[in-house]
């Protein structure tokens, strides 16, 4: 069966530091308008909470009663180069968390079964074994046990092969909890962000696990205007800022940043 997700062109309508189909102001407006159409208390308010030292905007999106019950936490943080970007980030964090935990808590989204019964439709055992770095040489024994474990399976899309497959949701949730939920102005935006979140976690975990020396990035070579402005705000506050290239061999840019205040050391 082909994927239910069908990717389409999503033309950029906003390109100030971010590539989005609409501006952050439109994102926030659309989000709040959508909330008016559902009989749920999801968003209580958005609040700017940065203390002004860096002058880099940070927002909270504070959960309403129903969102708090579903998510279990009171607020989400959003950040951006401008106040509107930061507020949009905060409300989209709320959107993705509310959607994710709503999905997780709905039994209708899952099929409780064993790998033995679903393997013709499911992610391969070999791929599942790689998720826990099993190099024991005893995969045959592990397979015998795994095949009989009752797991919660849910439908996913193999974009490479354009087909639906079953994913052992609780297996991956036990390992990584919610790794890569993402929201966007359209499916393509959300998917791009989710894939990039997985890449950054993947590369940073490899670098940390294997203690890989990676190239430093000379911040004086940065040419993007807003990025230079943000770097300048750290310098003006007396905070040391370092960046490293975490891309490894993925072909997808990933950057690690470290900031520290010398007055606290």
What does each model-found stretch correspond to?
Residues 1-265:
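Helix-coil modules at protein/domain termini and other flexible surface or pore-lining loops
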């Amino acid at each position: 069966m082909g994927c239910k997700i069908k990717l389409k062109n999503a033309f950029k309508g906003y390109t100030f530091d971010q590539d989005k189909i609409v501006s952050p102001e439109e994102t926030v407006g659309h989000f709040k308008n959508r909330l008016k159409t559902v009989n749920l208390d999801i968003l209580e308010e958005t609040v700017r909470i940065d203390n002004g030292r860096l002058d880099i905007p940070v927002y909270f999106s504070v959960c309403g009663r129903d969102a708090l019950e579903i998510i279990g936490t009171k607020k989400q943080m959003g950040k951006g180069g401008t106040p509107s970007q930061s507020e949009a980030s905060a409300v989209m964090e709320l959107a993705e968390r509310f959607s994710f935990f709503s999905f997780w808590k709905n039994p209708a989204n899952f099929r409780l079964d064993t790998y033995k019964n679903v393997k013709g439709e499911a992610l391969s055992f070999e791929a599942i074994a790689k998720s826990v770095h099993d190099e024991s040489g005893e995969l045959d024994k592990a397979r015998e046990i795994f095949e009989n474990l009752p797991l919660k399976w849910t439908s996913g899309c193999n974009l490479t092969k354009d087909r639906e497959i079953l994913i052992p949701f609780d297996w991956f949730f036990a390992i990584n909890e919610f790794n890569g939920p993402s929201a966007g102005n359209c499916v393509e935006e959300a998917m791009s962000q989710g894939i990039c979140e997985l890449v950054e976690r993947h590369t940073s975990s490899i670098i940390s696990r294997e203690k890989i020396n990676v190239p430093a990035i000379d911040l004086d070579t940065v040419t993007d205007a807003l990025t230079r402005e943000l770097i300048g705000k750290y310098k003006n506050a007396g905070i040391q800022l370092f960046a490293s290239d975490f891309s490894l061999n993925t072909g997808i840019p990933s950057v690690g940043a470290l900031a520290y205040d010398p007055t606290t050391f």
